[in-house]
Curated annotation (Swiss-Prot):
Keyword annotations from UniProtKB, A to Z: Cytoplasm, Isomerase, Porphyrin biosynthesis, Pyridoxal phosphate
Quaternary structure annotation from Swiss-Prot or TrEMBL: Homodimer.
Lineage: Bacteria, Bacillati, Actinomycetota, Actinomycetes, Propionibacteriales
Major location (coarse): cytoplasm
Gene that produces this protein: hemL
Compartments where located: Cytoplasm
Annotated positions of the N6-(pyridoxal phosphate)lysine modification: K270
Designated name of the protein: Glutamate-1-semialdehyde 2,1-aminomutase
Keyword Methyltransferase: no
Isomerase keyword on record: yes
Entry-linked NCBIfam families: hemL, PRK00062.1
């Protein structure tokens, strides 16, 4: 088996849908998924030997580029000493220190293996801290696939056009209230009615799983104000944006813009593990100390804080200094400008939105995308045409119009030229669909 089609067929025989995460199956764009054999810097190679400029970057973790030598070397050294111990290691403390140094409101950190575990634990912790049950989330915000948070979620749920998931009992979401994103008045109304029952509001610091939809000025600060007034906690999900948008995530960008607020709990993932399976939650010591073994809120995991992932995380954060983010911001603007020029030349109606170096394009939309309903109004068929034209020209984009595009510190001039050359034909393909 050497072709992507043969590999996909074989995978479908033994793995549901042939993939281990739904968006990888190309369900919304059609065609055969590329089976990746290797990755280096800004490039990936599929099973047929075709090279692509990668704008997925492992869905975010590859901040420094694929297979950054220093990170690979650190993991190899760690692996030579043992893959996992089920016991504490010094690199857990080193990585916790690195997170605390970057995130001023965080005083203690607990490591888990996935973003879903991080948000699931954060919700349990908030309920344990407040003695309340109700959780408020926002439509289109994705917080992993735990039952309580799958209501009106983004990411793969949005890609599949699903309201939630089969197998989630009504009782699991009975205490979940979904509010339109960027609607302070709606959130205020929920607190006016049920404020004494709400344990926490959970929000993506900047949603990037319904496309990139930045919070309007003051929105996250309003969440902080309302939760404080009603004795609830604020959980800020930076699984995707943490250490990606800036050294302090999207929260750091908001601090720079003068929005001074501090959530009770953050969740982190992706970049913090340097490409290895690792996530975390962190926050005020009085809240975090409610976790077992010091408190009554239980959480555990055989591979939580495993040495390979923590070593990769430590090395990644060591290398991701301020200059890396400055280069990424400049590079992202250059690539966005080129994308805009191609779409303008083709007469495509679109909206391009970014959060620091993260960005995504909404085709067929001519006004700001500020919530999930706006995001769903984009022309998904136009994105499909655009996606395949780019793929045929050697550019790997997210196989869903609801996902963010990622660059890395390794995306160089050669990668940019491949991207630039692919754009005109892809833009024309999108234009033809929109005008049909």
């Amino acid at each position: 088996m050497t072709s992507n089609a043969e590999l996909f067929s074989a995978a479908q025989a033994v793995i549901p849908g042939g993939v281990d995460s739904p968006v990888r199956a190309y369900g919304s764009v059609g065609g055969v998924p590329r089976f990746i054999e290797k990755a280096q810097g800004p490039w990936i190679w599929d099973a047929e030997g075709t090279r692509y400029v990668d704008l997925v970057c492992t869905w975010g973790p590859a901040l420094l580029g694929h297979a950054r030598p220093e990170v690979v070397s650190a993991v190899q050294v760690a692996a030579s000493k043992g893959l996992s111990f089920g016991a504490p290691t010094r690199t857990e403390t080193e990585l916790a220190d690195a997170i605390i140094e970057r995130m001023a409101p965080v005083e203690k950190v607990r490591f888990v293996s996935t973003g879903t575990e991080a948000t699931m634990t954060a919700v349990r912790l908030a309920r344990g801290a407040t003695g309340r049950d109700v959780i408020v989330k926002f439509a289109g915000n994705y917080h992993g696939h735990s039952d309580v948070l799958l209501a009106a979620a983004g990411s793969g749920v949005a890609t599949a056009g699903l309201p939630g998931s089969a197998g989630v009992p009504a009782a699991s979401t009975a205490d979940t209230i979904v509010v339109d994103y960027n609607d302070v008045a709606a959130l205020d109304a929920v607190f006016s009615e049920r404020g004494d029952q709400i344990a926490a509001v959970i929000v993506e610091s900047c949603p990037a799983n319904m496309g990139v939809v930045p919070p309007e000025p003051g929105f996250n600060a309003a969440i902080r104000r309302l939760t404080t007034e009603h004795g609830a906690l604020m959980i800020t999900d930076e699984v995707l944006t943490g250490f990606r948008c800036s050294p302090s995530g999207f929260w750091g960008l908001q601090q720079q813009a003068g929005e001074d607020f501090a959530p009770d709990i953050f969740t982190f993932g992706k970049v913090v593990g340097g490409g290895m399976p690792l996530a975390a939650l962190g926050g005020h010591a009085d809240v975090m100390d409610l976790l077992a073994p010091t408190g009554p809120v239980y959480q555990a995991g055989t591979l939580s804080g495993n040495p390979l992932a923590t070593v990769a995380g430590v090395k990644t954060l060591q290398l991701a200094d301020a200059e890396v983010y400055q280069r990424l911001d400049v590079r992202s603007e250059k690539w966005r400008n080129e994308l805009e020029s191609a779409l303008d030349a083709a007469g495509v109606t679109y909206r391009l939105q970014n959060a620091g170096n993260l960005f995504s394009v909404f085709l067929g939309v001519d006004s700001p995308v500020r919530n999930y309903d706006n995001a769903k109004s984009q022309n998904a068929e136009a994105y499909t045409a655009f996606f395949h034209a780019m793929l045929d020209a050697g550019v790997n984009l997210p196989p869903s119009c609801f996902e963010a595009w990622f660059l890395s510190d390794a995306h160089d001039d050669e990668a940019f030229e491949v991207f630039r050359a692919a754009l005109p034909r892809a833009a024309q393909a999108a234009a033809q669909v929109i005008s049909a």
